[in-house]
Structures are given as C-alpha cells and as structure tokens.
Amino acid sequence: MLVFLHAVFITVLILLLIGRLQLLERLLLNHSLNLKTVNNVLGVTDTGLKVNCLQLLKPDCLDFNILHRSLAETRLLKVVLRVIFLVLLGFCCYRLLVTLI
C-alpha cells in the first residue's frame, strides 16, 4: 500500500510539473511572438540599426535560435514527463487491482 501511495504522490507531482512546463512554453511563445512583432514593425532595411533598436527594446533575448531551441526542449521534456506519467498511472492501476483481488 505504501508503494501505491508513493506512486500516486509522484504522479501528482509530475502533473504539477507538466502544468508548469505548459506555462513556460506559453511564455516562450509569447516572448518569441513579441520579438518577431517588434522586428516586423521596425521594418528597417539596415540590419545593424535593426539590431540596435531591438537591443534597446529586448536586450536579454535577441537570438531567435535560443528561443526556438528552449521551446523545443520544453516540448520534449513535456512529452517525456507525459510518458512517465502514463507509466506510473498504469503501475498505480495495476497495484490497485492486485490489492483488490
């Protein structure tokens, strides 16, 4: 019974972590969209001037590749956690059936 409660506790923690990762994914998408919007609104042909304007507006996240990479890593981590969640859920159901029979 203790193993079952431990598995349920870990399953709940994984669900909370998946929720936090979804929030992080939304924040990354929002930040990426804001940078692209600022980039399109400026419409400056000189890339040096565009980078300087973007540095004034968003100095901490100019590299779109870093944003897209961290977004992909967040999505991959979310998939891995969902797989772990399903395995633990199956284990919990199995343990519950074994204890009931």
From Swiss-Prot:
Residues 1-23 form the signal peptide. GO terms for cellular component: host cell membrane; membrane. It is found in: Host membrane. Its main location: host cell. The keyword Membrane applies. The chain crosses the membrane at residues 81-101. InterPro entries: Corona_7. It comes from the Viruses. Pfam families: Corona_7 (PF02398). Keywords: Host membrane, Membrane, Signal, Transmembrane, Transmembrane helix. Belongs to the coronaviruses ns7/ns7a protein family. This is Non-structural protein 7a.
